């Protein structure tokens, strides 16, 4: 605390000469030259900001000893005055940049917790499973910082961003009990199968026409159809490009794509509020204002149709869509229509992106590693037979398939910084003696953990057997029980749709490998694993591969 006091005093004392300017330069001189006065005052306070930055490990947002509240100080890079580390994190791959920063020998405990500044936002990041568990499990980290785009896109009333409290607990209970229960996930298997069948047929057609398949458009169309069926009870003919249904599907794709871009874009004014009316290169405010009425009209129209259809029924079957489930809730759980719009929109938004991208990463590794593909195909064939069709029940008996999906999530976590950070609502003391001050944004660098040689042996190798206990591997629960690999988060804010996402990815990978032999066409460059981080971690170059049907029909 003494150090914190000294730091604070030095920052205040640094401005002394701003008040001595009249004596130094002469009051008459300054009054006669107002521009000189303004420049001198600006220089004085800029000097104070530089001195505060120089005395603040973690950068300008950590001035006045914020990182030294506990017995163990929180160290970190200073970055630049005013801006902190914003330039290092606003472009490129921030998970890799933070990983490199945390390995700085000048801060030996930075892997546990590292302080840094994103403009005026004080932040910490953990690259250590034990400290990450403390952060994700502590009740004072139950809230999320609400960025401008999330607030304007209605997410403040949805599960992901709603502040902890009675309303958020209601949403979490609805999600776990009514929307994503194991029974309801199982009941939606026919929809997952239908979407996979349509996807495989479309891939077979593209292979026949062009000699190769670009997987991402097919995966995204199937994922959107799948989540639309689960949430709204609607599916579209992905092979049709005309008609009212095709127009509606295109409208939905457009809204989801725009939402992805807005929520995934780095908005400088979230961290430098004084820039809000000066610099908005992504036009966040204008685009959000244009998108929200479209979303509200679309979702309210779906709710209205469901209300009309449900006049004679008040209960929801296990395979009912989410709209029917929400409309069937008892009075004490019933949501206002505006809140239903927010919750349903978030389901569509979050359920489309991750499923498609994880499946693409998985297939990229299958194509890159012929031995993995051969073993996976043998397991699928043994469980299903030559002319069968993999089911959820079959998938549950395929340990190597599950290991391939886990290894994909380890090598390419879809949210390398666990997507959305946490916000400290009170000072939080950690077991290592560090104290995270209230108002601090806390992150977990899951990518750094899954690529740490002290956590995972040979982390750069793609080795599914590391998750097969009978072969000496680890029995890891990826749903938040083990912070060595927690791609869906952990604690109170763990992703509510994790079971649905895992069920979809594993089933679709099984069907893709069962239906086709996958390989690179002659003359093609090797599969590139270069990344780009938008809302999720994507392949920079979409996967394109040849897909030879293994049977007369691909589906």
From Swiss-Prot:
The EC number on file is 1.14.-.-
Q: What does the tissue specificity note say? A: Expressed in seedlings, shoot apices and young panicles, but not in mature leaves, calli and roots.
Q: Identify which cofactors the protein needs according to its UniProt entry.
A: heme
> What membrane topology does the UniProt entry give?
Single-pass membrane protein
Traits of the deletion mutant: Plants double the number of leaves, and leaf size and plant height are reduced to about the half that of the wild-type. Some inflorescence branches are converted into vegetative shoots. Late flowering and excessive vegetative growth.
Q: Name one GO biological process term.
A: regulation of timing of plant organ formation
Which residues are listed for heme binding in this entry?
495
TM region(s), chain numbering: 12-32
The record, for InterPro entries, names: Cyt_P450, Cyt_P450_CS, Cyt_P450_E_grp-I, Cyt_P450_sf, Cytochrome_P450_78A
Q: Which GO terms describe its cellular component?
A: membrane
| Main EC class the enzyme belongs to | oxidoreductase
PANTHER family per record: CYTOCHROME P450 78A7 (PTHR47946:SF6), CYTOCHROME P450 78A7-RELATED (PTHR47946)
Q: So what family is this one in?
A: Belongs to the cytochrome P450 family.
Extra information: Plastochron is defined as the time interval between leaf initiation events.
Q: What is this protein called?
A: Cytochrome P450 78A11
């Amino acid at each position: 605390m003494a150090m914190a006091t000294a730091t604070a005093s030095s920052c205040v004392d640094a401005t002394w000469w701003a008040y001595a300017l009249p004596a130094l330069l002469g009051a008459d001189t300054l009054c006669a030259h107002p521009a000189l006065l303004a420049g001198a005052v600006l220089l004085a306070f800029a000097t104070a900001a530089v001195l505060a930055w120089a005395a603040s490990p973690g950068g300008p947002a950590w001035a006045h000893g914020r990182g030294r509240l506990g017995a163990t100080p929180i160290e970190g890079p200073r970055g630049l005055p005013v801006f902190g580390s914003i330039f290092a994190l606003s472009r490129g791959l921030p998970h890799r940049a933070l990983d490199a920063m945390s390995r700085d020998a000048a801060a030996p405990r930075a892997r546990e917790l590292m302080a840094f500044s994103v403009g005026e936002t004080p932040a910490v990041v953990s690259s250590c499973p034990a400290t990450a568990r403390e952060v994700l499990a502590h009740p004072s980290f139950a809230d999320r910082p609400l960025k401008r785009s999330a607030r304007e896109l209605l997410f403040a009333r949805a599960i992901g961003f709603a502040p902890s409290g009675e309303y958020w607990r209601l949403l979490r209970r609805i999600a776990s009990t009514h929307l994503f229960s194991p029974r309801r996930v199982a009941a939606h298997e026919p929809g997952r199968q239908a979407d996979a069948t349509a996807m495989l047929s479309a891939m077979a057609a593209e292979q026949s026409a062009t000699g190769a398949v670009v997987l991402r458009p097919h995966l995204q169309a199937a994922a959107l159809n799948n989540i639309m069926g689960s949430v709204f009870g609607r599916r579209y003919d992905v092979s049709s490009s005309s008609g009212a249904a095709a127009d509606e599907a295109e409208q939905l794709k457009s809204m989801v794509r725009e939402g992805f871009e807005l929520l995934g874009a780095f908005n400088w004014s979230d961290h430098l509020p004084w820039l809000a009316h000066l610099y908005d290169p992504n036009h966040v405010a204008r685009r959000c204002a244009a998108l929200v009425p479209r979303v509200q009209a679309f979702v309210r129209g779906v709710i209205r149709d469901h209300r009309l259809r449900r006049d004679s029924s008040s209960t929801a079957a296990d395979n009912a869509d989410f709209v029917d489930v929400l409309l069937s809730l008892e009075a004490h759980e019933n949501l206002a229509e505006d809140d239903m719009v927010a919750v349903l929109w978030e389901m569509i938004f979050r359920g489309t992106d991750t499923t498609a991208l994880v499946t693409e990463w998985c297939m990229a590794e299958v194509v890159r590693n012929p031995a993995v593909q051969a073993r996976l195909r043998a397991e699928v064939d043994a469980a299903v037979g030559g002319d069968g069709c993999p089911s959820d029940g079959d998938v549950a008996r395929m340990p190597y398939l599950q290991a391939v999906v886990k290894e994909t999530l380890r090598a390419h976590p879809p949210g390398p910084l666990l997507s959305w950070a946490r916000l400290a609502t009170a000072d939080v003391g950690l077991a290592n003696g560090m104290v995270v001050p209230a108002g601090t944004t806390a992150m977990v660098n899951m990518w750094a953990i899954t690529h740490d040689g002290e956590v995972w042996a040979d982390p750069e190798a793609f080795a599914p057997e590391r998750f097969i206990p009978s072969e000496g591997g680890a029995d890891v629960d990826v749903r938040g029980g083990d912070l060595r690999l927690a791609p869906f988060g952990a604690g109170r804010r763990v992703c509510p749709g994790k079971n649905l996402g895992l069920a979809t990815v594993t089933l679709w990978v099984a069907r893709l490998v069962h239906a086709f032999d996958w390989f690179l066409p002659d003359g093609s460059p090797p599969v590139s694993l270069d990344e780009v981080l938008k809302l999720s971690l994507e392949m920079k170059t979409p996967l394109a591969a040849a897909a030879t049907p293994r049977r007369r029909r691909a589906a």
